[in-house]
């Protein structure tokens, strides 16, 4: 059953993003000390995802004692499940998955369990029974939505406010949970969702959907945009500017991720508020793989703490951030 309320521990502290590459190994070989890991990534749809991939490659590098078999599924759930089955057939020591969507994982996770290959979930969650995977490490997406919604509730209050939403990939944990958390936070305010469509977490998708919103409602008919990630917000900014509007003023924008391009847009006043979603999960995932393979008992869920940024706060930290 779906675990929406995680009872895991919050993991604090900075994580370093190193610029190392993964090996191109073909299977579960290597010397006795090398741990072979298959990593099924969602794709390369956003700046956040690219930073997450680099963090994973650095943590699972040869220098760290790993052989990494990497697959990016281009946001295709069927292709991602096929990649996991390929890892199983190769006899890897462990599998790490950033699930594109929450549903449809029961069978392949059971296959991994039958092959005695532990699976670590990274970033996103699944609805499969918890005994089919060893652990999960990632962010509290519902809390991110709540924090974004709390800013909107404070900024607009009881003022009648027309909001449009750029959703993440349909069926994905961050899209589902960020929507749920935001809705909780704005309950009882004057904010009304007049339209909500998926931009699939991509900049092009955000631009295209926002163009449709503007054509339908006009710049003057939209007060607030809630984007489930920065890349979609950045695409929406392009659409607003192309229509003659001023992002951050004519249409206020709240977004989630805090990647560098998004933070710069916040500093420039084109985004009004950003909730962080830390992509640097590699070291934590690698540590979990080692612990699980060593037979240690590990917590099922592991949260990484997020923070929020105003324009002034973004200006103070942007030069020191790794992503």
Regions found by a protein language model. Name each.
Residues 2-8, 22-323:
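A residue-level marker of the well-folded mature domains of exported/periplasmic proteins
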Residues 16-21:
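C-terminal motif of bacterial Sec signal peptides marking the signal peptidase cleavage site
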């Amino acid at each position: 059953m779906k675990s929406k309320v995680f009872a895991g521990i919050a993991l604090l502290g900075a994580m370093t993003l190193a610029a190392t590459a993964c090996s191109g190994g073909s299977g579960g070989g290597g010397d006795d000390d090398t741990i072979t890991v298959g990593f099924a990534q969602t794709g390369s749809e956003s700046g956040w995802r690219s930073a997450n991939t680099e963090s994973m490659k650095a943590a699972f590098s040869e220098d760290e004692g790993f052989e990494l078999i990497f697959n990016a599924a281009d946001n295709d759930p069927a292709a991602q499940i096929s990649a996991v089955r390929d890892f199983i057939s190769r006899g890897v020591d462990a599998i790490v998955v950033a699930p594109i969507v929450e549903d449809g994982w029961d069978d392949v996770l059971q296959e991994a369990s039958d092959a005695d290959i532990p699976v670590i979930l990274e970033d996103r969650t699944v609805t499969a029974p918890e005994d089919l995977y060893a652990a999960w490490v990632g962010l509290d997406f519902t809390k991110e939505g709540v924090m974004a919604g709390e800013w909107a509730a404070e900024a607009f209050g009881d003022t009648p406010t027309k909001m449009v939403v750029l959703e993440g990939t349909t069926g994905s944990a961050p899209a589902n949970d960020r929507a749920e958390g935001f809705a909780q936070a704005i309950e009882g305010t004057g904010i009304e969702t007049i339209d909500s469509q998926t931009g699939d977490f991509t900049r092009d998708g955000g631009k295209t959907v926002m163009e449709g919103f503007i054509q339908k409602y006009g710049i003057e008919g939209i007060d607030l945009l809630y984007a489930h990630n920065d890349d979609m917000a950045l695409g929406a900014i392009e659409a607003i500017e192309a229509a003659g509007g001023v992002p951050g003023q004519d249409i206020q924008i709240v977004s989630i991720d805090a990647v560098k391009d998004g933070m710069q847009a916040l500093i420039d006043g084109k985004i009004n508020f950003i909730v962080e979603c830390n992509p640097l999960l590699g070291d934590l995932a690698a540590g979990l793989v080692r612990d699980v393979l060593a037979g240690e008992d590990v917590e099922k869920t592991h949260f990484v703490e997020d923070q929020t940024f105003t324009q002034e706060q973004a200006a103070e930290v942007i030069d020191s951030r790794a992503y």
